[in-house]
Amino acid sequence: MKLTKLLSALLVIGLVLGGCKSKKDSNDIVAPIATLYNEGIILLDKKKYKKAAEEFGKIFYQHPGNEMTPQAELMQAYSLFLAAQYEEAVDILNMFINLHPANIDIAYAYYLKALSYYMLISDVNHDQSRTFLSKDSFEDVITKFPNTKYAIDSSLKIDLVNDHLAGKEMMIGRFYLKKKNPMAAINRFEEVIDNYQTTYHSVEALYRLVESYMMLGLHDEAKKYTSVLGYNYPNSKWYSYAYRLVKNYQN
């Protein structure tokens, strides 16, 4: 009787272990690289981006030394980008850049990384660390690959990023003015003038400097910035506001 129970127990253990082994074996099957790649492309065409990324990702682990593997890594990153999984895309692209610095598509990898950071930019009410990462990454593209189409688009994107960063400084500066803290406000508006002068925020920043210096009683400084406004933006509403503000004090 005891022997029968022992044999039954061993049989159950054997079945369990056998089932686990079968399950493990099915997961460890190495599929042909062409099969995985084609399946990824099919899923990509069907807009099943996350599943496509999974298929392309299998190639890296199952065929790490294959000549198609770098292309599969890029396709995985691209699929993650389309799936709006931008941080995951950046991780794959960083790995690609480190492993394949001389790859024919290295410029695209840098560009897609910058674009992924760009998509992570939050509104001006939140932390802008990713905005700076985006700007730095686009600058990398321009520096490393100046004669590519990616450099041209990166330059345009930097203009948009700068506008965003200037908007953040303006928002903080206005807040300080509202709180009657013109010295802190001046630091923010001067940041816009010094580093983001090509953005459309610069004209308002000049006016806010006039406003801030008038609040401090430094009227000569206010007049100076009014003159700068008049010279550079004579038809701007901000120049009209500054001119009236200074003139009303004189009267």
UniProtKB/Swiss-Prot annotation:
Gene Ontology process terms (BP): Gram-negative-bacterium-type cell outer membrane assembly; protein insertion into membrane
For membrane topology, the record states:
Lipid-anchor
Does Lyase show up as a keyword for this record?
no
The compartments listed are:
Cell outer membrane
> Start-end of the TPR repeats?
33-66, 70-103, 166-199
Alphabetical keyword list: Cell outer membrane, Lipoprotein, Membrane, Palmitate, Repeat, Signal, TPR repeat
Q: What is its main location?
A: membrane
The answer to whether keyword Signal applies is yes
| Coiled coil region boundaries | none
| Lipidated positions per record (S-diacylglycerol cysteine) | 20
The task this protein performs is described as: Part of the outer membrane protein assembly complex, which is involved in assembly and insertion of beta-barrel proteins into the outer membrane.
Q: Which NCBIfam families match?
A: OM_YfiO
Description of how the protein assembles with itself and partners = Part of the Bam complex.
Protein name, UniProt field: Outer membrane protein assembly factor BamD
What organism is the protein native to?
Rickettsia prowazekii (strain Madrid E)
**What's the name of its gene?**
bamD
